[in-house]
Amino acid sequence: MTDYSSQGACVLTTGQRYNNLYKMLDKNSKIYVAGHNGLVGSAIWNNLMGRGYTNLVGRSHKELDLLDPVAVKKFFDEEQPDAVVLAAAHVGGIMANLNYRADFIYQNLQIQQNVIGESYRHGVKKLLFLGSTCIYPRMAPQPMKEEALLTSELEYTNEPYAIAKIAGLKMCESFSLQYGCNYIAVMPTNLYGPNDNFHLENSHVLPAMIRKVYLAKCLNEGDWDAVRKDINLRPVEGVDGSRSNEEILTTLAKYGITPEAVTLWGTGKPMREFLWSEEMADASVHVLLNVDFKDTYKPGDKEIRNCHINVGTGKELSIREVAEKVVAEIGFRGELRWDASKPDGTPRKLTDVTKLHNLGWHHKIEIDEGIHRLYEWYKKGICINHKS
């Protein structure tokens, strides 16, 4: 068992803690963004660069396996970052969470253990951990305040992932309380944006909707060239554009995509909140640069807990409404159907963003503009990858 008490620059007397560690990062600070190629990590990277923080470090999964403790230690030994943004995680939609429960809890716990542990041992000044609002109970009072954490049962479909993320935020909280570290956890709502995951096997709700409706539109219009370009870029169950029309139709039909209709999971009734990923990045960088752990709880609290920060819009709409907006944006003339035999997930998920607002950040991009931006980004990506 590791004895942390004799390691790391966070071990300070009470009087030293905030004076020594709670300092603003300057533009020469070396910042490691774990997961810098992902949806949020890439947006955080770009946001930092745009603010003049250019001493950034990133590694692809091929270059650095965050599940490997030896490799992670070697990376920290060599790079000695001043700050860390932990945006790397094993993520997926309802189907993936149901089918690969062990992967979701094991891999996320291992990533967090390795990165947070080495950050402590190497005296990292500031760490920002990205979680998810799935940490809250299935029937949490709405909108969900940070204080709702661990008050009742979690949603079954993503329970392993949620437990891993709860462990991550509690690691940040506990290291900060015991050792005086400056580790903060932020819990974003449903995110979407550039570099999103559009693979039908494991994508989240909004990118999955956009791709399904787009492919159905192409089939409806008989545009097989567009269909083949799409699945050449992102094959579905190994099926790409070289296959026959019949094989492609059979495979897409498994995911509710036909020329006549798009069929989505559930009833469409659950209420959800969506935040543009570049705004999540802006909120994250705002917290990284301007908020310290001591700002996340009330002075004088005897029991300090729930120090994480919700990040969202504070606005919600039903999955059905989102789907209808996607259909309208893309211009699909077929039917939109719902398979009520499939799970809906949590009935309602809306964050209370009062703490975030009090810390000085508000969102700007609304859902209609976001859907338009994401669809344009998706189409542009297909075109770029098929230039002759």
For the regions a protein language model found, what residue spans apply to each?
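SDR active-site strand-loop-helix element
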Residues: 34, 59, 84-90, 127-133, ...
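NAD(P)H-binding glycine-rich loop region in Rossmannoid oxidoreductase-like domains
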Residues: 69-109, 118-121, 133, 138
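Adenosine-cofactor binding site in Rossmann-like domains, unifying the SAM/SAH pocket
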Residues: 49-74
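C-terminal substrate-binding subdomain of Rossmann-fold SDR/epimerase-dehydratase oxidoreductases
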Residues: 20-21, 28, 35, 39, ...
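Conserved Rossmann-fold NAD(P)-dependent oxidoreductase catalytic core, especially the SDR/UDP-sugar
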Residues: 113-159, 184, 197
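Active-site Tyr-X1-5-Lys
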Residues: 114, 156-189, 205-221
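Short-chain dehydrogenase/reductase
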Residues: 105, 109, 157-169, 199-207, ...
